[in-house]
Design a protein with these regions (language model features):
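Conserved glycine-rich FAD pyrophosphate-binding loop
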Residues: 92, 240-362
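General beta-strand structural signal in soluble alpha/beta enzymes
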Residues: 5-8, 24-29, 42-43, 62-64, ...
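FAD-binding subdomain of flavoenzyme oxidoreductases
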Residues: 84-85, 94-206
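Short, conserved charged micro-motifs
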Residues: 69-70, 189-194, 224-232, 279-287, ...
Length: 362
């Protein structure tokens, strides 16, 4: 890939570029997620730094190109976290870049705790961005009750850089739980994830290894509460062989999940499929993949299949979105006619020159 990269150092620089540019562009953060392009790249890597952090208010404001690792380090010092556990793709995709906080929200990157606290977009409070006409727009605020521009904030989360160049984000953070434990349930079916999430014991993570028939159920909170809920879940699953991963072992396991290390052994093509939680097992039965895992209580399916196996063609009868991460298929799931119409309507308002990330929209 021999694309020219522009790295503006300020929001004003971004605006100047967009006012004068007529050729299609690709917006990138730390380039830690795989999107093939030969277009000129606008990198936000120089829009870097934490602008404001109020631990007591559970909010942070940062420039979009701030590395995710810098955000995490600052939060760790105050025993706080990005509760939605944004996953790191760079190790899996063997890319040199580092995830940025703007990239996290632009791709709505959300980890296992999504089932408890929501996705990345649910933690985004406000956003500044420059649209395709060179307008600097700001929506949302730094506190949850400020809902000015609420819909646009949510729209930018998960837009993959198709509506504008995000320059600044404000978001909520949460305290790190006092302790955690994970139940590892042996020789079980995937339906046990739903059984666990439907208990009153506030499960914060579920994961299922289809090949090994192993389920992992995470509990977090205050020490006494975690011990009580673990005891109750042991009773709930008394018909199964259950091991307990105590705090450090549990933390290590879920960190490996966030780093996607469980996918490193996959040979062939790698797919990430989002469906209704009740359809996760159905996808496995239809596709019969070589390797598969379930997250989000079955709503997120990771698939390792033979090279050239068309997952989208096989899953046509199941509503969902299949992204090809490693393979020779288009990375993004094709949009329906209605989705394209709605997307184009929104896009015309923010990018009338059709500058941004065309390879994603197409």
């Amino acid at each position: 890939m021999n694309a020219v990269t522009l790295a503006p150092g300020s929001e004003s620089d971004v605006r100047e570029i967009l006012l004068s540019e007529t050729e299609q562009l690709h917006i990138a953060g730390g380039q830690s997620r795989l999107v093939a392009t030969e277009k000129k790249i606008i990198s936000t890597s120089q829009l870097n730094g934490i602008i404001e952090y109020e631990p007591g208010a559970l909010t942070m404001v940062a420039k979009a190109g701030t590395p995710l690792s810098v955000i995490k380090d600052a939060l760790q010092k105050e025993n706080q976290q990005l509760a939605f556990e944004p996953p790191e793709m760079k190790h899996l995709l063997r890319l040199p870049g580092n995830s940025t906080i703007g990239g996290v929200f632009s791709t709505n990157a959300s980890g296992s705790r999504r089932i408890q606290v929501g996705a990345a977009r649910d933690h985004l409070l406000g956003v500044r961005f420059v649209d395709g006409s060179g307008r600097v727009l700001k929506n949302g605020g730094r506190v949850m009750k400020n809902v000015t521009g609420y819909d646009l904030v949510k729209l930018m989360a998960g837009s993959w850089g198709t509506l504008g160049v995000i320059t600044e984000v404000s978001f909520k953070v949460l305290p790190i739980a006092e302790t955690q434990a994970t139940l590892r349930i042996n020789s079980c079916q995937a339906s046990i994830l739903t059984q666990a999430i439907n208990t009153p014991y506030d499960v914060s993570g579920t994961f299922y290894d289809v090949g090994l028939k192993l389920a992992y159920i995470r509990i977090e909170g205050f020490d006494k509460s975690v011990k009580y809920r673990v005891e109750q879940l042991l009773r709930e699953f008394s018909d199964f062989e259950v091991d307990i991963l105590e705090m450090e072992e549990s933390k290590k396991f879920w960190q490996n999940m966030s780093d996607l290390k469980f996918l490193k052994e996959i040979k062939g093509d790698l797919w990430r499929v989002s469906v209704k939680p009740t359809d996760g097992s159905k996808i496995i039965k239809i596709l019969d993949p070589k390797i598969s895992f379930l997250d989000w209580c079955g709503g997120l399916v990771w698939l390792g299949v033979d090279q050239g196996f068309d997952v989208r063609e096989k899953m046509k009868k199941v509503a969902g979105h299949a992204m090809c991460l490693l393979g020779n298929f288009d990375q993004f799931h094709p949009s329906s006619t209605l989705e394209k119409r709605l997307s184009n309507s929104i896009r015309n308002k923010f990018d009338p020159k059709m500058l941004f990330n065309q390879e994603i929209l197409n």
